[in-house]
From Swiss-Prot:
Protein name: DNA gyrase inhibitor YacG
Gene from which the chain derives: yacG
Record text on cofactor binding: Binds 1 zinc ion.
Subunit structure: Interacts with GyrB.
Its biological purpose: Inhibits all the catalytic activities of DNA gyrase by preventing its interaction with DNA. Acts by binding directly to the C-terminal domain of GyrB, which probably disrupts DNA binding by the gyrase.
Taxonomic source organism: Pseudomonas fluorescens (strain SBW25)
Required co-factors: Zn(2+)
């Protein structure tokens, strides 16, 4: 039988078995999952976008929505 895939917890670096039984994957625990969620909520993590793409999102050149 082969070894289950193991990944590192993104929060603490602990090894985590990637199995259906591990409901916290890729995290090792609920605690690490909540720490990561808090970091996203505090905007410590961001998805990169091109600088001008953000300007287009908030452009005043768009017609008003009614």
């Amino acid at each position: 039988m082969s070894q289950p895939l193991t990944v590192d917890c993104p929060t603490c670096g602990a090894p985590v078995e990637w199995t259906a039984a591990n409901l916290n994957r890729p995290f090792c625990s609920d605690r690490c999952k909540l720490i990561d969620l808090g970091a996203w909520a505090a905007e410590e993590h961001k998805i990169p976008v091109a600088p001008d793409a953000e300007d287009e999102l908030f452009s005043e050149d768009l017609p008003p929505r009614h």
